[in-house]
């Protein structure tokens, strides 16, 4: 059975100018990779130049009984971009909001043990705050709609000290050993509220059921929670041309909460069996997953096939709704697909336990960037 060892995090993920590769838990203090010594071996370059090749991404995916959503923030030094997509699970109806954030030095913090990511634009307000030392996580968001889109307001909170709140940090080559990518994954049960306000009516969707008056109050069982979040922060050196594919899946199989993330790109390490960021959180345990191959032989809107060579992952993804954003300015070209759909198949944990997925909510992403 495939496995990778998970160890205690080092004091710094860069020591003596070299990255410390591996999988770590709990969370390290920072994801700062700027101190690498000569990450580009073509010629000696000052740090202020090589640091411009570092970009950061933050992604938060959430699942509730009625809705499935994902938020992605791109920190590209000279500009930041945020996109939130929300789908109604019963109908597949989509709400999409985008925001350019200019003249911000760094929207995604370097620290990971605690941090805050905010945007206070009038029509796009979001605040993401986490603190592992206090065991707190919160996400507040208010989005102003228009005649075709509802106003969206939601707030989530989670307990990072809960036994089902699991995290994993991977430091991997990108793709050579001189450069690295630092990726932090967190999965946790959520509580909070969610509301949609249309121009003609108000639809409120509570995430937690209130106890009847006079009933005894008790702590909910996190294993039976219906609301889950998957939080990812990635900081990496990028090529001038980069493309990647990913799949994030959340759901419950036979009463066991299942959450995992699969990722592959043209910056995968030369030895992906030894270093990769794929991870499964199931039954209160963390399982490093092997590298995968993601193909879509029937087109992006047809069935996707996700498999590995270790017989741990055998999945099919069926797209429901594709959100596309394309930009082309001089030599800059981007093409991002954020696809909501259903996932079916099987996945195994490190003990060989087989989980069968049926009608799981998932979001797949296919991204291309040329600078």
Regions found by a protein language model. Give the residues of each.
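Structured soluble/peripheral alpha/beta segments that form catalytic or ligand/cofactor-binding pockets
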Residues: 1-371
């Amino acid at each position: 059975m495939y496995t990778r060892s998970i160890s205690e995090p080092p004091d710094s993920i860069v020591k003596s100018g070299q990255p410390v590769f591996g999988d770590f838990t709990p969370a390290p203090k920072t994801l700062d990779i700027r101190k690498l010594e000569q990450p580009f071996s073509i010629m000696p370059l000052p740090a202020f130049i090589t640091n411009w090749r570092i970009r950061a991404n933050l992604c938060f995916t959430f699942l509730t009984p009625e809705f499935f959503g994902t938020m992605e923030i791109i920190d590209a030094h000279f500009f930041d971009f945020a996109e939130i997509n929300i789908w109604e699970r019963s109908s597949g109806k989509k709400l999409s909001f985008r925001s350019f954030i200019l003249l911000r030095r760094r929207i995604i913090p370097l620290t990971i043990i605690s941090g805050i990511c905010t945007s206070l634009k009038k029509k796009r307000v979001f605040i993401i705050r986490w603190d592992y030392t206090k065991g707190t996580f919160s996400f507040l968001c208010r989005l102003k709609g228009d005649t075709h889109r509802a106003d969206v307001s939601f707030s989530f909170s989670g307990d990072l000290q809960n036994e089902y709140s699991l995290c994993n940090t991977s430091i991997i080559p990108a793709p050579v050993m001189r450069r690295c990518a630092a990726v932090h994954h967190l999965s946790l049960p959520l509580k909070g509220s969610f509301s949609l306000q249309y121009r003609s009516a108000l639809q409120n969707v509570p995430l937690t059921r209130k106890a009847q008056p006079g009933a005894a109050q008790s702590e909910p069982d996190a294993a039976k929670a219906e609301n889950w979040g998957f939080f990812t922060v990635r900081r990496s050196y990028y090529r001038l041309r980069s493309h990647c594919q990913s799949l994030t899946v959340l759901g419950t199989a036979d009463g066991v909460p299942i959450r995992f993330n699969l990722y592959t790109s043209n910056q995968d390490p030369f030895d992906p069996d030894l270093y990769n960021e794929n991870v499964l959180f199931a039954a209160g345990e963390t399982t490093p997953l092997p590298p995968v191959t993601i193909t879509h032989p029937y087109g992006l809107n047809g069935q996707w096939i996700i498999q590995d060579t270790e017989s741990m992952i055998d999945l099919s993804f069926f797209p429901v709704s594709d959100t596309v954003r394309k930009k082309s300015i001089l030599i800059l070209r981007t093409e991002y697909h954020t696809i909501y759909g259903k996932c079916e198949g099987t996945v195994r944990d490190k003990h060989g336990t087989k989980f069968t997925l049926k009608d799981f909510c998932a979001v797949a992403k296919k991204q291309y960037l040329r600078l």
